[in-house]
């Protein structure tokens, strides 16, 4: 068995080998039972509350079972655990779970206020497609955020913005233009030093 450790999170980030004996359990039950048995290794205090089944999909060998992370019922963006099962056995676990999230999950500002802030920032007349309250991990810190997706704007510079607004103080955590240009899309966000910075992002199909 190979175990790779994440020093920052203090958890196993990847495990591979024959991790279980062959089982007739469903892939979902086999996976969540394994996580329950080894929850300390993955940094999960309560798997039944902190994980939700996202989907299962085919792997080159076997099948992946994907769980997304939850915090007080909210999705934790990027937080997940993926289990690979071959012939009734778990063979790999990839752990992106973010432990010890210290963020209050009751917002201070409303969705309407957050949407108005986002609209002013990107100067967009377009309506929003979707908006949701999430926990967003960005540059080593977790934020309670409104994730606001704006509809496609064809020009003069095509855009489909996704904006994360801090749900406690109304500051902008991250702005992404999710339209795929040649190469990369652009985004900007507040760094750990409090400075707004730009970066390249990639998103398949511009979705």
What are these regions (language model features)?
Residues 1-207:
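Zymogen propeptides/activation segments of proteases
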């Amino acid at each position: 068995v190979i175990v790779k450790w994440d020093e920052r999170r203090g958890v196993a980030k990847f495990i591979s080998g024959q991790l279980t004996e062959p089982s007739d359990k469903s892939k979902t039950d086999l996976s969540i039972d394994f996580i329950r048995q080894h929850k300390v290794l993955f940094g999960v205090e309560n798997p039944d509350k902190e994980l939700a089944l996202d989907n299962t999909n085919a792997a080159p060998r076997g099948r992946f079972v994907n769980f997304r992370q939850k915090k007080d019922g909210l999705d934790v963006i990027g937080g997940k655990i993926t289990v690979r099962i071959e012939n009734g056995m778990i063979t790999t676990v990839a752990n992106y779970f973010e432990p010890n999230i210290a963020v209050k999950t009751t917002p201070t500002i409303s969705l309407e206020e957050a949407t108005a802030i986002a609209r002013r920032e990107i100067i967009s007349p377009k309506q929003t497609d979707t908006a949701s309250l999430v926990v967003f991990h960005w540059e080593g810190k977790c934020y309670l955020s409104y994730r606001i997706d704006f509809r496609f704007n064809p020009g003069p510079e095509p855009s489909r913005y996704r904006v994360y607004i801090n749900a406690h103080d109304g500051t902008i955590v991250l702005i992404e233009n999710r339209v795929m240009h040649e190469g990369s899309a652009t985004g900007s966000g507040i760094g750990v030093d409090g400075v707004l910075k730009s970066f390249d992002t990639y998103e398949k199909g511009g979705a």
